[in-house]
């Protein structure tokens, strides 16, 4: 016998109505779409530097695994239908999901879910949020680099195109997402 959906939710989730839950998911997918617009194309790699990863991390850390996954699955569905939610440097739609950055995009729901799952498992401290974001980034880059290997036929080339140039920026995104998450949770307690 399966449990009702309301029993599977955390106490904080049950406090929100279904309309509020849906609004959070839709709002989070829109937030990631806005983050995708903040893009810096790099001439030496097909992977642009964007704030998308930051948005994905923040959504996962703030909304938890279920809503984080739902928000990023919705984001991908929006992109597949042709809505301009992906980075403007790519072709958009299915072509963007099948292009060089597809491995990163496809991982987004799982990245948000992993970050959210870790945050749900203990005290909501900066260290936990940063650790959750780092582990989620490892999943993100493992997926993105694996996908790039298909295009470059070289693991070393995939690392050059999709990892090395982004390390410093990703550290900043992790710290920013962790800081906002724990700061916001502190403000909400007051």
Show where each model-derived region lies:
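Alpha-helical membrane-inserting segments
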Residues: 31, 35, 39, 59, ...
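Hydrophobic transmembrane alpha-helices
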Residues: 1-69
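Short, flexible helix/strand-to-coil boundary loops that buttress conserved ligand/catalytic motifs
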Residues: 89, 118, 159
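Peri-membrane helix termini and adjoining interfacial loops of integral membrane proteins
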Residues: 1-5, 80-88, 152-157
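Membrane-embedded alpha-helical hairpins and interfacial helices in multi-pass inner-membrane proteins
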Residues: 45, 122-190
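Alpha-helical membrane segments and adjacent membrane-interface helices in multi-pass membrane proteins
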Residues: 39-114
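Hydrophobic alpha-helical transmembrane segments
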Residues: 22-27, 54-58, 68-73, 101, ...
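Short helix-perturbing small/polar motifs within transmembrane alpha-helices
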Residues: 2-13, 20, 34, 92-142
């Amino acid at each position: 016998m399966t449990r009702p959906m309301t029993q599977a939710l955390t106490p904080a989730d049950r406090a929100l109505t279904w309309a509020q839950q849906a609004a959070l998911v839709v709002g989070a997918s829109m937030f990631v779409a806005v983050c995708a617009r903040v893009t810096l194309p790099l001439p030496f790699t097909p992977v642009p530097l964007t704030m998308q990863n930051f948005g994905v991390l923040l959504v996962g850390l703030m909304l938890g695994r279920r809503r984080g996954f739902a928000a990023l699955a919705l984001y991908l569905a929006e992109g597949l239908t042709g809505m301009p939610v992906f980075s403007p440097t790519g072709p958009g739609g299915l072509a963007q999901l099948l292009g060089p950055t597809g491995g990163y995009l496809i991982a987004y729901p799982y990245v948000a879910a992993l970050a959210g799952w870790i945050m749900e498992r203990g005290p909501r401290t900066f260290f936990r949020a940063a650790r959750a974001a780092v582990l989620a980034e490892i999943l993100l880059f493992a997926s993105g680099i694996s996908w790039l290997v298909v295009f470059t036929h070289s693991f070393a080339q995939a690392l050059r195109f999709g990892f090395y140039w982004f390390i410093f920026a990703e550290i900043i995104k992790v710290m920013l997402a962790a800081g906002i998450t724990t700061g916001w949770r502190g403000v909400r307690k007051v």
